[in-house]
Amino acid sequence: MQEREEKTMIIDTHVHIGGEAVGFHMTEQMVLESMEKYHIDYALVSNGDAGEMTHKQELLPDEVQITQEKALQRMLVFARQHPGKIGIQVWVKPYLQGLTKELETMIQDNLDIIYAVKLHPFHSNTSPTDEKVLPYLALAEKYHLAVVSHTGGCEAANPVHLYEAAKLFPKVPFVMVHMGLGTDNKEALDLLGKADNLYGDTTWVPMSTTIEAIKRYGSKKMLFGSDSPIDGVDTYFCNPKGERSLYQDYFHVLPEKISGDAYEDLMYRNAIRIFGISL
């Protein structure tokens, strides 16, 4: 198995635990094992336990719904146990809960390890500009947090809605996770240049799209992210069928296709700047 040579620092801005009710199997131990095996220096992690809907966008049964506060509490334990390795993105539940005082207090009390609000417009079927979501965006602005959002798969998750949210909150960094999952990324690429506070990540994004983004806009607009460990501990290497992961391109091919500075921006420097990470 080809593992990445340990050279450039890597911050993975899109890592998960939880999500069993939705059908995922992603544990804290899997995250740590994968980070160790593939030399990931730091991970921003969100808890899929806060997912609200199935892959068919049907509400999960009440008995398996987990509050956003309980999901965050699990993340707080994980991050506190691994200082300097794990940061938090707070996965929220706009469809069923909305912003609560309890959630805000938990965030306010843990700003040293919380870096972003995590939206999932597909698993909440709620647009980033929906009135249920706007209080979360205002919260991000209040506490100088970024907003990261899944894009792609349904109307609510169309990248244009995150662009519209970015225009509403110009002081908040917004990250288009996936750059429109399941698309040719063209819409997201065009939107990337229309708002200074709008960024993209590499999660399931072909290397060619990232190269095009750097060509158009310079090296400050894209972040490395992976969805690990969604395909298991070896997400960075292959899927469960043994098929090569596109992240191997990011580790072994991309460094020969862009400048060293651009590669370092993508793999860690942009994350430090955009999220305000202190290592």
Q: Residue spans of the language-model regions?
A:
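Distinct, well-ordered alpha-helical segments
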Residues: G98-Q108, S127-Y136, E155-F169, D184-L192, ...
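Active-site gating loops and adjacent loop-to-helix segments of metal-dependent hydrolytic enzymes
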Residues: Y38-Q65, N110-I114, V172, P229-G232, ...
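Active-site gating/metal-coordination segments in enzymes
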Residues: R4-E5, E58-V148, K194-L198
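H/E-rich (His + Asp/Glu) clusters that bind or coordinate divalent metals
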Residues: P173, G180-L279
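An N-terminally biased module of ancient metal coordination in phosphate/nucleic-acid-related enzymes
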Residues: M1-K70
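Conserved, mostly hydrophobic/aromatic
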Residues: H14, M35, M75, V117, ...
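Hydrophobic faces of well-ordered beta-strands that scaffold small-molecule active sites
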Residues: I11-V15, A43-V45, I86-V90, Y115-L119, ...
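Active-site environment of divalent metal-dependent phosphoester hydrolases
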Residues: G18-E20, A50-M53, P94-G98, S124, ...
